[in-house]
């Protein structure tokens, strides 16, 4: 009976996902796993930071377990079919892995940061475009902003990372922060952009030997972000999928409750969950 209930719950989530995706072109975000997202936005299907490997296919980063630590809970075709654009914040394996390299068409449109130009060229992607600052793609405005992937010596090890800001007529402005810690630059971006939606990587990832220097936002930094987010909805992802991420959904939820942050203000997505972005 327990197995039957589990199976029904799994297929129930999948059915809900398919049903919501069948709506006309209403804007939404679906969390696949970790920081991999499907955006239905301005009439386009956009894939963000695809890590498509099966559970345990990538090395451990904290000496705890191989990564990812959980399987993708939806069919691969549901993720990749009809994708028109791929946004890649940076090319660490938890944001663009060997599986994504092998599964995605080499002719798919990719937008990447300047630091990763040679990476996509070397992988044979013929429609990868390096975004320095701003661009127009079809009916979308896309802006790239820098993120800070840690501090001190850890930052030197982690390299460059980026966030993306999406806007289009009649659509909410979406700020995909990418892998970044809380900084004055992020705060200024929010003040300048005034986004309607902020997607934050809140897993509190740490590098072994530098546990006091998080490389993405943890629960405390996420609270700082929420307090500076104005009227934006904050959507938290990048949790419960990697062995070096110490901030779990439960930890973040408890911190939000302690700070009187409502579930309407801070949305903690679960794998396969869809959140409608429409104003």
Short names for language-model regions:
Residues 54-55, 91-96, 117-120, 135-136, ...:
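Active-site environment of divalent metal-dependent phosphoester hydrolases
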Residues 33, 41-43, 50-52, 114-116, ...:
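A mature extracytoplasmic/lumenal domain signature
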Residues 48-49, 82-92, 111-113, 174-180, ...:
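Active-site neighborhood of phospho(di)ester-bond hydrolases with catalytic His/Asp-centered motifs
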Residues 44-87, 98-100, 183-192:
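Pre-active-site segment of Zn-dependent metallo-hydrolases
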Residues 56-57, 74-137, 151:
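Active-site HxH/HxHxD metal-binding segment of metal-dependent hydrolases
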Residues 115, 181-271:
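Cap/insert and terminal regions of metallo-dependent hydrolase folds
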Residues 1-63, 228, 263:
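Zn-dependent metallo-beta-lactamase
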Residues 21-26, 32, 112-171, 255-278:
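Metallo-beta-lactamase
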């Amino acid at each position: 009976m327990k197995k039957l209930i589990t199976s029904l719950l799994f297929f129930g989530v999948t059915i809900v996902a398919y049903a919501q995706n069948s709506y006309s072109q209403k804007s939404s975000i679906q969390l696949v796993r970790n920081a991999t997202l499907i955006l239905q936005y301005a009439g386009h299907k956009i894939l963000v930071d695809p890590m498509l490997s099966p559970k345990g296919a990538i090395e451990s980063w904290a000496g705890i377990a191989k990564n990812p630590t959980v399987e993708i809970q939806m069919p691969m075709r549901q993720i990749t079919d009809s994708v028109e654009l791929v946004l890649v914040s940076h090319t660490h394996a938890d944001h663009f892995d060997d599986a994504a390299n092998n599964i995605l068409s080499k002719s798919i449109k990719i937008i990447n940061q300047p630091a990763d130009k040679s990476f996509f060229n070397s992988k044979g992607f013929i429609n990868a475009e390096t975004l320095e600052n701003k661009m127009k793609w079809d009916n979308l405005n896309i802006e790239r902003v820098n993120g800070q992937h840690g501090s001190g010596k850890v930052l030197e090890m982690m390299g460059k990372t980026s966030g993306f800001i999406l806007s289009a007529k009649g659509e909410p402005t979406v700020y995909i922060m990418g892998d970044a810690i809380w900084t004055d630059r992020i705060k200024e971006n929010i003040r300048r952009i005034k986004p309607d939606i902020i997607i934050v990587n809140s897993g509190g990832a740490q590098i072994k030997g530098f546990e006091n220097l998080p490389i993405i936002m943890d629960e405390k930094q996420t609270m700082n972000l929420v307090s500076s987010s104005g009227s934006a909805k904050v959507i938290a992802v990048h949790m419960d999928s990697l062995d070096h991420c110490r901030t779990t959904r439960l930890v973040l939820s408890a911190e939000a409750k302690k700070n009187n942050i409502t579930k309407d203000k801070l949305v903690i997505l679960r794998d396969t969950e869809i959140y409608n972005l429409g104003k």
